[in-house]
């Protein structure tokens, strides 16, 4: 609504408390004209505070209104503070405006959403300016609920945002109304654990895989700093074949599968605890990788 006002470029409306009372409220109550009608006239207590910025004639972070006040009780002097879906609650002490004799009174109020006295406090603040020493006995004799003709109110949100209660409004694109859906965080499944093979592959042309990269002969023993036990070398398949050919024997070690002993390895008469060609390989396969 500010585009309806003929204001000069760079105009800002930041009046002091004295200016609001002396130059605006006093003239309004006296039915005198105001040079620039920059303050709207509404019944402020019929609206929620977040609806008021759209009803103001001017304002960016603060909005000003002339509003009447009604009595809470027909025979009392307390104002009715119910407004929209909640109520305004006074906070702090009243501040007199004007020296040496106060001309107006400033009162601070906070808006609570819901029914009193269990409403939820919001960040909406109102500074209400009223004239001091006003005789309201005439209106009381007429049994009127009107307490004051006009008070001047400054409305603002102390967090600088026009917060509102209730669900957010739908987003409008052209002629279509699209509802905002809640954002759901995408669940990312963790990668499957890598499975290690339980089987070892032996190439007949080479020896059993080694735990270290340095090649060793059958007579070398290499101790890695990563292991506390020794790593024994593995016999080559070609060595076993040579032994077998020299003895005119195949790789038949006479292994007794019942009592797990070698009866006659390579045709010899040695006992079962003597060395035989597969001992190194069996010991290697029993060690954990």
Swiss-Prot record:
The keyword DNA-binding applies. GO terms for biological process: cellular response to hypoxia; negative regulation of abscisic acid-activated signaling pathway; response to wounding. It is found in: Nucleus. GO terms for cellular component: nucleus. It comes from the Eukaryota. Residues 7-158 form the NAC domain. SUPFAM superfamilies: NAC domain. One of its GO terms (molecular function) is DNA-binding transcription factor activity. InterPro entries: NAC-dom, NAC_dom_sf. Keywords: DNA-binding, Nucleus, Transcription, Transcription regulation. Interacts with KIN10 and KIN11. The NAC domain includes a DNA-binding domain and a dimerization domain. This is NAC domain-containing protein 2. It comes from Arabidopsis thaliana (Mouse-ear cress). The gene is NAC002.
């Amino acid at each position: 609504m500010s585009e309806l006002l003929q204001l000069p470029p760079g105009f800002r409306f930041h009046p002091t408390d004295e200016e609001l009372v002396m130059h605006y409220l006093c003239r309004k109550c006296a039915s005198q004209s105001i040079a620039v009608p920059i303050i709207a006239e509404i019944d402020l207590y019929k609206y929620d505070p977040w609806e008021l910025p759209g009803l103001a004639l001017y304002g960016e972070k603060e909005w000003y209104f002339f509003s009447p006040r009604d009595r809470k009780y027909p025979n009392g002097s307390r104002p009715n503070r119910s407004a929209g879906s909640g109520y305004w609650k006074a906070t702090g002490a009243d501040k007199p405006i004007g020296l040496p004799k106060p001309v107006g009174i400033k009162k601070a109020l906070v808006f609570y959403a819901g029914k009193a006295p269990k409403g939820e406090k919001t960040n909406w603040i109102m500074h209400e300016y009223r004239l001091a020493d006003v005789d309201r006995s005439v209106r009381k004799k007429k049994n009127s609920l009107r307490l004051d003709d006009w008070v001047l109110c400054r409305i603002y949100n102390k967090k600088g945002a026009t917060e509102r209660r209730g669900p957010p409004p739908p987003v409008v694109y052209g002629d279509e109304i699209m509802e905002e859906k809640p954002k759901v965080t995408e669940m990312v499944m963790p990668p499957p654990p890598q499975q290690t093979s339980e089987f070892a592959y032996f190439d007949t042309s080479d020896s059993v895989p080694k735990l270290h990269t340095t090649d060793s002969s059958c007579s070398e023993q290499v101790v890695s700093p990563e292991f506390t036990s020794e790593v024994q070398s593995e016999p080559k398949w070609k060595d076993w074949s040579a032994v077998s050919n020299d003895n005119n024997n195949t790789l038949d070690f006479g292994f007794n599968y019942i009592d797990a002993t070698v009866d006659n390895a390579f045709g010899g008469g040695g006992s079962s605890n003597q060395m035989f060609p597969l001992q190194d390989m069996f010991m290697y396969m029993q060690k954990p990788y």
